[in-house]
Structure formats: C-alpha cells, structure tokens
C-alpha cells in the first residue's frame, strides 16, 4: 500500500474531503478553518485539540507530498488549501461519490460498521439502502489499485463486523494484528486498533524526523 498517512494527516485530508462536499461555498479552507474542522466535536473520533501551528506543519508536509495544494490570489488574503488526494485533475486515485463518502468517514472516525457508515456519511452521499453501502465497501476492498478498506473480525457479542481504511498501514500488518486480538473478549478491539494506529503514526513521524535530520 503506497499510502502511509499518520493519524493527524488522515484527519486533515478527511476534513478537506468532507468540507469540499458539505460546504463547497467555504472551500478551499484556510489553516484556521482546517484547524476548526480537525477539532470539531461532531463526526470525529477521537476528538482532537490541535493547535494551528501543528495543523500548519501537517498541511506543509501534505503539500510537499502532493496530497494537497495551496490556493492564493484572486482576492484571497490568506493561503487556502484544497485536497489533491483523490479525483484531482492529474491524480491517479479516482473515487465515486459513494466511495468518497465512505473513505472520508473512515478517515474521520476510524473503524465502523456498514450501518454506522450509512448514517454518518449521509451528508456526503445519500445511500439508497444497506446493499449500496456494502457494495461500495466491497468495491473499495477489491479494487486492483487498492485495497483501500478491510473488514475486521467481528467482535464478540456484536452483530456486524467493522471496516477500517488502509491509508495508514499495509494490509498484512493490519490483518495479523486483527487476527491476534480477535479472540480477546475482555478488551475492546476498537481500543486496540486505535492504539496500534497511534503507535504506527508516532513511529512514522519519528522515522520521518530522523530521515530529515540525516538528509541535512
């Protein structure tokens, strides 16, 4: 998997994707608007408290990696940002509106069931029924240029399996971790996965910092 986003990078991109669809009149977003979106209490898991400085650092890094681009001029006093993560003119990653809604909601809230995704992604795409949600997830999991999502083992006592995005790690690692924790009944699988994602993100940031230092 060529995408390796940290947890905060996933939040930033998810916010830009969300606002592009739900509030197009306010898009692209300034660093202040991105910060407010990242720290938003609704439709976010976990709720963050990022500083504008932190968000600016992540925006700069994502611009360098060509996931975002800056927009200035034409009466804009401040630099604004728009996503180039998917469906951009020169990018290879193309998603349908249903796929954008699912991917965005997973980036913003982590692993969720198809039922939760249908409800939470409804502002971005009106799914006709659960079959459309499940078909969209299947498409994202089986695409030749993916996979972009995976189904987690069902938690004990739960009726539905959850799905998670794969933009922050490779399939094999996540599958092995999911299989390792699936028999454990006394701990929440969600907490274990969230902790893993945070650890991977922190390790990647430390590696990026080390590589940058070595390159000086």
From Swiss-Prot:
InterPro entries: DUF480, WH-like_DNA-bd_sf, WH_DNA-bd_sf. SUPFAM superfamilies: Winged helix' DNA-binding domain. This is UPF0502 protein Ent638_1581. NCBIfam families: PRK11239.1. Belongs to the UPF0502 family. It comes from the Bacteria.
